[in-house]
């Protein structure tokens, strides 16, 4: 099977008019309008792949998953969680315990950067029964977020006129 290799300048030159097909995985290139608005590309043909735009980017929810960091062998008393600068540090340690194969002890340290727009004073942490440690906290209200609501602007009076009176 012959595969045509295109020069990057000519690749997807008419991108907004021709959406990606199922196997046209284009990584590292910019997004087009149809990537943001998938309903535009679905009207052309049902055989074109639908682009998935993640609507949760502005929802204030972020998630870090790592299966190796499960803490199912630890109780909440064995875990120490603290915020240091812009990081959350997790330390887990339990004393030596006996299991089916002998004695075992576990200890781990993890450190994750917190988002810059997170209200650190109201972060909560919970440990589920299946060993998933969950952090949650609200976003800070930035000046851009607060500008969407109504905000009064005071009007002051100046004693001198700003322009010469017209004759």
From Swiss-Prot:
Residues binding Zn(2+) 2: 101
Kindly list the positions annotated as binding Zn(2+) 1: 94, 96
Name the species this protein comes from.
Pelophylax lessonae (Pool frog)
Q: Which UniProt keywords apply?
A: Acetylation, Cytoplasm, Eye lens protein, Glycoprotein, Metal-binding, Nucleus, Zinc
Principal location = cytoplasm
Q: Where does Zn(2+) 3 bind?
A: 148
Quaternary data: Heteropolymer composed of three CRYAA and one CRYAB subunits. Inter-subunit bridging via zinc ions enhances stability, which is crucial as there is no protein turn over in the lens. Can also form homodimers and homotetramers (dimers of dimers) which serve as the building blocks of homooligomers. Within homooligomers, the zinc-binding motif is created from residues of 3 different molecules. His-94 and Glu-96 from one molecule are ligands of the zinc ion, and His-101 and His-148 residues from additional molecules complete the site with tetrahedral coordination geometry.
Transmembrane domains' residue ranges: none
Q: Which GO terms describe its cellular component?
A: cytoplasm; nucleus
Q: N-acetylmethionine-modified residues are where? A: 1
Q: What is this protein for, i.e. what is its function? A: Contributes to the transparency and refractive index of the lens. May act as a chaperone, preventing aggregation of various proteins under a wide range of stress conditions.
Q: Where is the composition biased (Basic and acidic residues)?
A: 147-161
Which family is this sequence assigned to?
Belongs to the small heat shock protein (HSP20) family.
UniProt-annotated location(s): Cytoplasm; Nucleus
Residue positions with a glycan: 156
The gene that this protein is the product of is CRYAA
Identify the InterPro entries for this entry.
Answer: A-crystallin/Hsp20_dom (IPR002068), Alpha-crystallin/sHSP_animal (IPR001436), Alpha-crystallin_N (IPR003090), HSP20-like_chaperone (IPR008978)
Cross-referenced PROSITE patterns:
SHSP
Q: Where is the sHSP domain?
A: 47-158
User: In Gene Ontology terms, what is a biological process of this protein?
Assistant: negative regulation of apoptotic process
Report residue spans for region: Disordered. Answer: 143-167
Single GO MF descriptor: structural constituent of eye lens
Specify the protein name.
Alpha-crystallin A chain
């Amino acid at each position: 099977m012959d595969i045509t290799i295109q020069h990057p300048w000519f690749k997807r030159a008419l991108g907004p008019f021709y959406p990606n097909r199922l196997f046209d995985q284009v990584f590292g290139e910019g997004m087009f309008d149809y990537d943001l608005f998938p309903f535009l590309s679905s009207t052309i043909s049902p055989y074109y792949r639908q682009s998935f735009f993640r609507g949760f980017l502005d929802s204030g929810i972020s998630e870090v998953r790592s299966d190796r960091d499960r803490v199912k062998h630890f109780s909440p008393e064995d875990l120490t969680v603290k915020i240091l600068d812009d990081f959350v540090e997790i330390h887990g340690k339990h004393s030596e315990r006996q299991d089916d194969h002998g004695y075992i002890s576990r200890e781990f340290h993890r450190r994750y950067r917190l988002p810059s727009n997170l209200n650190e004073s109201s972060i909560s942490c919970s440990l589920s029964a299946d060993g998933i440690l969950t952090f949650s906290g609200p976003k800070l209200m930035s000046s851009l977020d607060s500008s969407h609501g109504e905000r009064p602007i005071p009007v002051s009076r100046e004693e001198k006129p700003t322009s010469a009176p017209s004759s």
